[in-house]
């Protein structure tokens, strides 16, 4: 197919195809070689190779341009969409992952990626359960449940996960954290104070009800309520 027309004509056709040209690039090595005429690797081409799990083309691009940034981008994007197969092919045997890659997975609820790096030795509880705090802030409930199932502490870093979820109005996340040990009373009911400050009334009502269950209405009204009213 490639030999039917001169390269110059194919270049015109590829320009005409716009974003669809990336699929044509990956038909075979001849078409891919046209993309290599560019001095800088096109990130959209990297994305297409990952989405189609075209490992051969991805390795060719990385080898040709010989830029570590391309591999970094490929790994980051793969973590974001959960393409564990690409990740396995791109990393050495002793590679256990980085917080940046886990962050990409958490942002997109890709627990299969997190599980993969955990199986290679990545510490999911690194830096006082930083990943759980991040999941709470990003409202990645699926990931939060996964991390807690692996031993993450909902009271980590002075109850930070609940505080971050409350500040950002993530009601289901707040409920999950409280049900799994987060302290409603920590730091003088800081989570309630912040939820109220940002207008998350459903969270305020829920946390107040939970606090009353723990300390009783009298103590709640006399001691806790004045702290944030």
UniProtKB/Swiss-Prot annotation:
Gene3D superfamilies, A to Z: Ankyrin repeat-containing domain
Start-end of each ANK repeat:
70-95, 96-126, 127-156, 157-186
Pfam families in the cross-refs = Ank_2 (PF12796)
> Does Repeat show up as a keyword for this record?
yes
Is the keyword Repeat in the record?
yes
Which keywords does this Swiss-Prot/TrEMBL entry list?
Answer: ANK repeat, Repeat
Name of protein: Putative ankyrin repeat protein L148
